[in-house]
Amino acid sequence: MKAVGIVVEYNPFHNGHLYHVQQTRKKTSADCVIAVMSSSFTQRGEPAIVPKWERARMALAGGVDLVVELPYPFAVQTAEWFAQGAVSILDALFCEQLCFGSEHGSIEPFIKTAQLLVYKKEQHNEKVKQYVRQGINYAKAYALALYDIGHDTLDVSQPNNILGLHYVKAIIEQRSNIKPETIQRIVAHYHDETLPVNDNIASATSIRRFLQVSDDDVARYVPHTTYETLQTYRHTYMTWHDWEKYFPFLKYRLLTMEVDDIQQIAEVEEGIEYRLKKAIIHATSFHDFLSAVKTKRYTWTRLQRICTHILTNVTKKEIAKAIESKRATYVRPLAMNETGRAYLQEVKKHMTLPLVTNAKHMRHDPIYQIEKKATQAYVSILPEPLCSEALQREYKTPPLR
């Protein structure tokens, strides 16, 4: 069987994702579509609107054959580390291709620019440092440095272009046999906050925003199974997962932590701990808090990731230990259909990473130890007994079928 990999968050699964799955299968003629999906928190440092199990169920209904977990140490990271973890999992699963959505739509510029980054790494890094010292934020410095070392390069100001670039770069660095492919995104942009009037494809950002107001507003922008899954979760748990729900927990953490303790948290650098400590005293919402802390050097996304690390109590030392090899240490299926099950049966004897379907077998793994803390933090907003039930689901739920 031929497998193609995709890297996803499905926060939530919408019509644009459905198009991506369909076009991926069409473009690659793959027998099995494998999705590596972020678990409880996303790459931009946000709680997923519903848990991974619900999102995995949406994925199966949308045409994915096998959903595997991208654990927290790679999921809540810069694009580079996010890609390293995802590619290592797809490589372990013997995927022949990786197909991602992008604003560009052609794979050649991704390959050319990725090769430039790999083979001129030191030159690029030095240029980035020069721009950062001038007070420019990392994302902008990265783009400027890339232009300096190779004028005819990919537009990395677009979020899906930058992710795609790092997928290709990770493939090269890991010497993987995976062949990268890309599909041009249609209609909605990644950060659009409004729902389009004359189309049925909207960004996940706008869908999450309007779910806070009315479920009915988003029905035309998501597959029916997604809509039903969202409604069922809201009816059962009486909440969506978003930063405002977690803000009291974050505030408690910051108020009771010493500055020295905050300094140990992943991604905390350059004295930002003092701004965090000062701003939390008067902040009455997560949005107000981040607005008070944000600087030119610290983007909203980076601050959200820092806040996620504070909430989950993940330190620099823990992260460094977990991802030192730049590769995942296990493959954890979350959901599969018959095609996905048959594919796993075919490849599992040859896999170099353990295939784990029960969390108790990963208790001593550094990556899973962080993933476990993230799950515990994620379910903490739920009332009892729902909170305890959600924790048990993490440890006992077999892959959905």
Curated annotation (Swiss-Prot):
<dbReference type="Pfam" id="PF05636">
    <property type="entry name" value="HIGH_NTase1"/>
</dbReference>
<dbReference type="InterPro" id="IPR014729">
    <property type="entry name" value="Rossmann-like_a/b/a_fold"/>
</dbReference>
<keyword id="KW-0819">tRNA processing</keyword>
<keyword id="KW-0067">ATP-binding</keyword>
<feature type="binding site">
    <location>
        <begin position="7"/>
        <end position="20"/>
    </location>
    <ligand>
        <name>ATP</name>
    </ligand>
</feature>
<keyword id="KW-0547">Nucleotide-binding</keyword>
<comment type="similarity">
    <text>Belongs to the TmcAL family.</text>
</comment>
<dbReference type="GO" id="GO:0005737">
    <property type="term" value="C:cytoplasm"/>
</dbReference>
<dbReference type="GO" id="GO:0006400">
    <property type="term" value="P:tRNA modification"/>
</dbReference>
<keyword id="KW-0820">tRNA-binding</keyword>
<keyword id="KW-0963">Cytoplasm</keyword>
<comment type="function">
    <text>Catalyzes the formation of N(4)-acetylcytidine (ac(4)C) at the wobble position of elongator tRNA(Met), using acetate and ATP as substrates. First activates an acetate ion to form acetyladenylate (Ac-AMP) and then transfers the acetyl group to tRNA to form ac(4)C34.</text>
</comment>
<feature type="binding site">
    <location>
        <position position="160"/>
    </location>
    <ligand>
        <name>ATP</name>
    </ligand>
</feature>
<keyword id="KW-0436">Ligase</keyword>
<dbReference type="InterPro" id="IPR008513">
    <property type="entry name" value="tRNA(Met)_cyd_acetate_ligase"/>
</dbReference>
<protein>
    <recommendedName>
        <fullName>tRNA(Met) cytidine acetate ligase</fullName>
        <ecNumber>6.3.4.-</ecNumber>
    </recommendedName>
</protein>
<dbReference type="GO" id="GO:0000049">
    <property type="term" value="F:tRNA binding"/>
</dbReference>
<feature type="binding site">
    <location>
        <begin position="185"/>
        <end position="186"/>
    </location>
    <ligand>
        <name>ATP</name>
    </ligand>
</feature>
<dbReference type="GO" id="GO:0016879">
    <property type="term" value="F:ligase activity, forming carbon-nitrogen bonds"/>
</dbReference>
<feature type="binding site">
    <location>
        <position position="101"/>
    </location>
    <ligand>
        <name>ATP</name>
    </ligand>
</feature>
<keyword id="KW-0694">RNA-binding</keyword>
<dbReference type="GO" id="GO:0005524">
    <property type="term" value="F:ATP binding"/>
</dbReference>
